[in-house]
Amino acid sequence: MKKKWIGICLAAAGCMVLLTACRDDAGRGPKDSGEVKTVSWNTPMEKDGRILLRLANNQKPDHPASEACDYFAQLVRERTDNRIQIQVYHSSVLGNEAETVKEVEYGSIDMARVSIALLTSYNQELLALQMPYLYKDEAHMWRVLNSGLGDKYLESMEEKGIEGLCWYGAGARNFYTSSREIRSPADLKDMRIRVQESSFMMDVIGTMGAIPVDMPYEDVREALKNGGIDGAENNFPSYASAGHYHEAPYMIMDEHVRIPEMVIMNRHVLEQLSQKDQDTIRQAAYESSLRQRELWTEYEREQWKVLEKVGVRVLYPEDKTGFREMVRSVYDMYGQPYEDILSEIRQMGGPGA
């Protein structure tokens, strides 16, 4: 398959050298006295050298996605007798999600765990998996991701130099606000709501009457503190673990979108490895996906207890019809090219989906 590679400037190459040379002192990556060879698209692999791959992750070390990434690295290390080591950098050490996607594309980082909201520029069809109020529940979403359709999307960016290794879940996204409760779509009018750095998500929130403000996840709490935004939208475990309830104590469980995540890898780096090593990495990634799903379920239970303890005001819409009506124009703007795919997704949800 023909690859479309983008040239890398000297600054990016220099950054890659620095990343390779700097060892992680926080215990996040493998520490070994033996020689470790870094693989990148412009660095040939030494036949007998060990290989260091870098994986970027924006979550804190105790987040389910982070623990799953660590598990992935552990499996690869064990199954290659320590010959291939994946060093995981948590807490946005290597940049925010949007930055790390580009770095994986360029080859200055080998892997990243990212929301697919940041991948639609590589394949617009990924929007079909993110449409508002599409899934009945989490089980419905996982049936889609584990189907042939999900496999197709993991492979859909290969011509852009990126391979999706596996899926991670990220729950359902809900609104939370600092000044007033959200009981209906009308309550969102003119509220400044933080969204992911995605034009699609800006349109989703904009059609619901709010003023979307795109910003990195790491900046949300400070913006809530200084009044730069009136609220945000995210899954409730992230809302709890980040402490956003201190500044935004009102949340409505409207579950407007479920946006899966991917562990992605630079395709050219992967192809430098033997077929056996490629298979090992793909299988380990798949097993980390299963582990992440288990961890996420437990994480939801733990973080819900946090919200109960601090007394967050949680509302449940009796009827989501009003919210669904508000986002109908999103389907007109984005869904028409993917009507067959959306129909297939709905069918996987069973009656009423």
Label each PLM-derived region with a short phrase.
Residues 23-139, 149, 158-353:
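N-terminal secretory/targeting leader peptides
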Residues 1-9:
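Bacterial N-terminal signal peptides that target proteins for export
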Residues 18-21:
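C-terminal motif of bacterial Sec signal peptides marking the signal peptidase cleavage site
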Residues 143-155:
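Signature of the catalytic double-stranded beta-helix
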